[in-house]
């Protein structure tokens, strides 16, 4: 029994010990390499080869998708080169109705989406007005 415990203790020491016999027992620290930093470095090298220059003071950028949603960037990092724009930062995919100030940015090609939004707003307004009862004063009912 004691021999078994001694053998197990010796095995445990071998796994924990990182040096020789007289070294302190400690666990090896595992460092995880993040692949995103490598990808970012490669991207920055390619952008530097293109010769992009940063554009400051851009508050927002919107990409209009064919399905009616918008990819919205708030305070993006914008860089430009010849016929090339790079927009990076945190983005959100939102429906067009959730960002009403972008309607002014839409062109003639998005006229169908504007009509759909107007119909949806008017239908919602009509649905809400039916539920509100008419207020009647007690004096006029005599």
Swiss-Prot record:
Family: Belongs to the NAC-beta family.
GO aspect biological process, one term: protein transport
Record flagged with keyword Metal-binding: no
Alphabetical list of PANTHER family matching this protein: TRANSCRIPTION FACTOR BTF3 FAMILY MEMBER
Record key words, sorted: Cytoplasm, Nucleus, Protein transport, Repressor, Transcription, Transcription regulation, Transport
Segments of this protein annotated with the region Disordered: 17-38
Boundaries of every NAC-A/B domain copy: 37-100
A Pfam match: NAC
One cellular component (GO) term of this entry: nucleus
Localization per Swiss-Prot or TrEMBL: Cytoplasm; Nucleus
Role description: Component of the nascent polypeptide-associated complex (NAC), a dynamic component of the ribosomal exit tunnel, protecting the emerging polypeptides from interaction with other cytoplasmic proteins to ensure appropriate nascent protein targeting. The NAC complex also promotes mitochondrial protein import by enhancing productive ribosome interactions with the outer mitochondrial membrane and blocks the inappropriate interaction of ribosomes translating non-secretory nascent polypeptides with translocation sites in the membrane of the endoplasmic reticulum.
InterPro entries: BTF3 (IPR039370), NAC_A/B_dom_sf (IPR038187), Nas_poly-pep-assoc_cplx_dom (IPR002715)
Name of the gene this protein is made from: nacB
Assembly: Part of the nascent polypeptide-associated complex (NAC), consisting of nacA and nacB.
Organism the protein comes from: Dictyostelium discoideum
Highest taxon, organism lineage: Eukaryota
Protein name as annotated: Nascent polypeptide-associated complex subunit beta
């Amino acid at each position: 029994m004691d021999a078994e415990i001694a053998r197990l203790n010796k095995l445990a020491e071998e796994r924990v010990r990182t040096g020789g016999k007289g070294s302190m027992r400690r666990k090896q620290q595992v460092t995880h390499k993040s692949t995103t930093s490598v990808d970012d470095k490669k991207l920055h090298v390619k952008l530097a080869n293109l010769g992009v220059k940063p554009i400051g003071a851009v508050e927002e950028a919107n990409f209009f998708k064919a399905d009616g949603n918008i990819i919205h960037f708030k305070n993006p990092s914008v860089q430009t080169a010849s016929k090339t724009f790079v927009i990076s930062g945190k983005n959100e995919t939102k429906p067009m109705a959730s960002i009403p100030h972008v309607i002014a940015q839409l062109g003639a090609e998005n006229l169908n989406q504007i009509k759909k939004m107007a119909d949806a707003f008017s239908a919602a307004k009509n649905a809400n007005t039916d539920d509100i009862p008419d207020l009647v004063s007690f004096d006029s009912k005599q």
